[in-house]
Amino acid sequence: MSDAIRAFDLVAGTYDDWYNHPQGRQVFDAELNALDLHIPKEGIGLELGAGTGIFAEHLTGAGRTIVCLDPSREMLKKAVERGMASVLGVGDALPLRVGVLDFIYMVTVLEFLDEPVAVLEELRETAKGDAGLTVLFINSESSWGDLYRDIGSKGDPVFKHARLYTMAEVEALITVSGYSVTERVGTLTTKPMETEVGGAITELSSENGVIVLRVHAS
């Protein structure tokens, strides 16, 4: 078990507390809205690194089924408690049948992957040929990136294991993994110290705290 997986196991019981904080709830709503607009309304999807299943639960709807996959047993127990279909596993060796998934998405997962290219290639090879992948990640160049980098350097049990990326770095990973970017948007347009979170979906700028990419196999 990697140190990062062990860290998520240890914080599973309190991981969602941030979303009950007024600012945390606004961040959640902004990210949820961005995801909802950039994954199909129908089909079978996979949330890679689904953790407690909080996003999958809110994104599941009529015609849209989501399977949660995570390597942390303790985090995944929370997803099961939410009633989500859940699979214990890792992204570079998916325990799923090839050609079933209509879409895949990940939320702040790229930052914790030891071998991101291997994972992205596995996703491409496992999903349907026309399936899209949606990647939400922290913008390393933003003030939110500065915040998470700072708390990681100060020993936060989770973010000390994170590797933040710039937009250019993520696009390079996407390209070498056999994908092409078809859409780029951002959200979190305000700084972390502001109580009101800018949750609008915008064209990309250095101020966007998170970036959402929609990509397809080349």
Stretch-by-stretch model annotation:
Residues 117-129:
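A short glycine-rich, Lys/Arg-flanked "PGG" loop and its adjoining helix->strand segment in the class I
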Residues 181-218:
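A C-terminal cap/extension of S-adenosyl-L-methionine-dependent methyltransferases
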Residues 1-41, 54-58, 78, 132-161, 194-195, ...:
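Conserved class I S-adenosyl-L-methionine
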Residues 105:
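A conserved beta-strand element that flanks and buttresses the S-adenosyl-L-methionine
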